[in-house]
Structures are given as structure tokens and as C-alpha cells.
Amino acid sequence: MKIAVVGSGISGLSAAWALKDTADVTLFEKRERIGGHSCTKTVDYDGRKIEVDVGFIVYNALNYPNLIAFFDALDVETERSDMSFAVSNPSGYEWSSNVRGFFAQKRNLFDPAFHHFWRSILRFNDIAREELDSRRVKDTTLGAWLDRHGFDENFRENYILPMGAAIWSTPEDRMLEYPALSFFRFFDNHRLMHKERPHWRTVTGGSQSYVKKVVAALGDRVRAGTEIRDVSRFGDQVKLEASDGRQHVFDHVILASHSDQSLAMLGDEFEDRRFMLRSIHYRPNQIYLHRDPALMPKHRSAWAAWNVLRQEGEDICLTYWMNTLQNLPKACPLFVTLNPNMPPAEDKTFSSFTFDHPQFDTPAEAAVREIKRVNGEGGLWLAGAWMGSGFHEDGLKSGLETALSLGGKVPWVPQNISPRRAPEKVAAEGAHLKIVGKNG
């Protein structure tokens, strides 16, 4: 069976890897670089070469069981990381989740508002866990839930909204539209509403270390620099057109791309999938890799792995302290910042680029449920982290679920993955998909 995978993020890589021994699989990527959000930049830091991740950075044993098994199968080396969190307000108000940083400003020790803020966090954790168990928050947005329980602006602006915005790379006002049940489920699963938190890890040498191992396993099945531009019906077949017109025929095609990218490729004959995908949106985030501490909290004691700098405008400004996250040399301060109103100093900036992230709301959740119901019909499969909560484990699960549905195999017992049978019509008719691509 010939299968094409379009897109080389975690979903496409895992799908192609799981299919490599059971099918004639080809992986297409429009860029020359393979890996999607698994992106490692090499910086020249005063003559010293340092590898820095700017997309996927960390994972944990509790919430990423398949990713851990994937890394074990690839023999990927990993190490401990840190996941502390800080908020810095334009008014000068700052705090971080580590003990030293919680009272980074000594005035917080004696500030009744700060103690009320701390009690509000505990109250949120208690009520959210209770209502999660009772399922009373179904079809309720986070904003409506916060209103119902009377959480004040201090709690919203300095804890729950910046934390949610940082996790999902989403403007704070959009977080108010996030489905409350999904929000609480994520916080509970990641132990963010509990005293005991999971230990986080990072890939030694950067995420490109695992990408290189997957690419090596796939060999000449990888076709970089091949952009698929159109997907349409062609009788009982499906035609995929790329930028230079070379043609290939496959039995199944997996579009392992962002939802908006898949939407742009699909022709009118796939209007059912197009209709669903229109409800799932992505948002660009401007990212800088730099060494400018001006984009960190003012108090050094408040510095954390994740630092939200609240600013005017709708975009969140988030700075990752990469030395803490990836155990990089402290003598070489390195930061990755998303969406600052004022970019880092030019002479302290190594590179800038854009990553797009999925935006989640109730219509998007409903659309994903419908896509899962029809996935594979007509030989067309959709996969991506956007089909879950947008994280690396979600992308891996989506890719593996699709691959296992088509007979792929992995050397572990998959967790929380439910393969579906390829639709009988496709199997019976042997419908082919035609791909027009650049690398014959």
C-alpha cells in the first residue's frame, strides 16, 4: 500500500515512522527544514556554538507517555528541566512560582491584596477540581465561569489569564472564550491545581536530535522542498498538485499540517472537511531568539523558566529563559520571546521568525469531533496537534492514530490512542490519490 504524508511536524514524522515497515510511505515537506515546531537554532555566542530550541522544548512523564516511548524507541537522550512561572506587570508588580520569587518584592509580604491573590489561587484550584468531577461546567467558557464565582481582576490579570495565554500562545482576551471544562481538565492532568507537580524534561542537544533520528530511519522516503498546493477529486481518485507538476499515485494521503494549511489545500469536492476546518483557527506569533534581559522581570529574583510580561495590546509577551529550560551555560544568557511590543535590542538579537499556534474555543472543539468521525473517508486523513490540545503529545497521538488505522506499527503499547478502520469503501475500491510533487 502506497501512502503519502504531507507535513513533517510531530504528526507527520510519527505517522511516516510508524508506517515505514508496513507500507510504501513517502513524507512530503514544503520547507527544506524537517521538523515543524521541533526547531533547534544554532547561535554563535561570542564564538561559542550553542543549540537552542525555539518551538517544542519540554515534556513530562505524566502527560506525554507516547512521546516518552517514542524517544525510548529512537534512543533519544534527555535531561531534567525546570518549569517555573512568573508574571511581570507594567505597574511593577511581579511574582514567580518558585519560593524565592513568590515574594520577589518584599512589599508582597505585608500586602493584603497579595495575600488575597494567593488565597484566590487556592480557591480556584479547589472549586475547579470539584466542578471538574461534577461536570457542571459543560458548555461554559472560562470567562463566564470566572464571573459566576466572583474571581477579581487581580487574580485574572496576574494568574489565570497570563498562565493560560502562555500555555496556548493565545491573547489573554481569547482565553476568556476557552471552554472551561477543557481548561480545567488540562490544569488537572498537568497537576497545575495540585501541590505535587510532574518533573519536566528536555531533549539533550535540542529537539532536532530526535528529528534527525526519524529522518535517518525514513531515508529516501523524505521529500523536502515539495509544496502540495491543491487536493481535489479526480473521478474515483484524488489529485494533489504541487508547485512543479510532477505526479505520484498513492492509496492514502495523510495531511499532517496545520488546520488552516489543510483547508487551503482542499478543493471544493472535500467541502465537508473544508466546512469543519473553517472553525479551527491559527494565530501567528512573532518570536525572537536573543540575549537581552530587558525582556525579563525587573527583579532578578522573580526570573523563571516562563515569564509573562503584561503589555498594552492584545498579544501576550512571553519570555522563555532557555538557560533554565535547557540547562544552557549560565554565563551565556539566552531568551526566546514571543510578541513583545518592543523587540529586543538589535545587537542582542540572534534571529527572529514566526510560528503559528492553534486557537481553541467551543466551535473548534465541535469541529474536531466531526473530523475524527469522518477521518479517512475518500482516502483522505487529517492529523495534527490541533486535533488535541495543541501539544507535542497531541500531535504524536494524532499521527500515530492515523498510521495505526492504516496498518502501521510501534514497538510499545500506545496510550490513549484509538485507531479506526480505514473506511470500507476506500479499501474495497482501492481508490488512489494522485499527488503532484517535485521529487519524483
Mark where each language-model region is.
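Conserved Rossmann-like nucleotide-cofactor binding loop
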Residues: 11, 33, 260
